[in-house]
Amino acid sequence: MNDTLKQIGSTGIVPVVVLNKADDAEPLAQALVKGGLPCAEVTFRTDAAEESIRRIAKKFPEMFVGAGTVLTTEQADRAVGAGAKFIVSPGLNPKVVEHCLKKGYPITPGIMTPTELEVALGFGLDVVKFFPAENAGGLKMIKAMSAPYTMMKFMPTGGINATNVRDYLACNKILACGGSWMVKGDLINAGNFAEIEKLTREAAAIVKEIRG
């Protein structure tokens, strides 16, 4: 496992962020750092994503910022060019995975079936995103797939919350969980970064409680 994935694993929870305005990037990053989760997956669902990553990477070098919802090789290049330290995609697009590996970008593609998992193994990956986690069978499905694929670690995302994250984190097949409950869009849009910091601190406490 590469150092990037090890750092994600040490964080335990990766806040999955949707930013509509790049001006929200710095106060959000500050809230996450102060709350104890200096990590963020900024999704490429908005026009502000690239600039948001750039601002976070520049202002908060201690922040482990990556890009999520990366669907194309061009998005991957833009994200890394802006300062993203890792790439996450919702599905497994062989073209995107191959491009990222060739360029040396840490890539975690999404899977939800054993067939997709085997494709990931074929690329030499040892961590995959399990998405959409809860709708795709949750922890029960991950444990079932782990039986024949003992070498693979998972980063479940989708439907993870402050309640069920404990069960996921307690499983030794889980590298980290992606979640957005501490960075909800309405809180970001309202500029309520104090509440985001509070929720982030609570999330970080869960990681410490479960993993020590």
Where are these regions (language model features)?
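Conserved N-terminal beta1-alpha1 strand-loop-helix module at the mouth
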Residues: 1-82, 102, 151, 162, ...
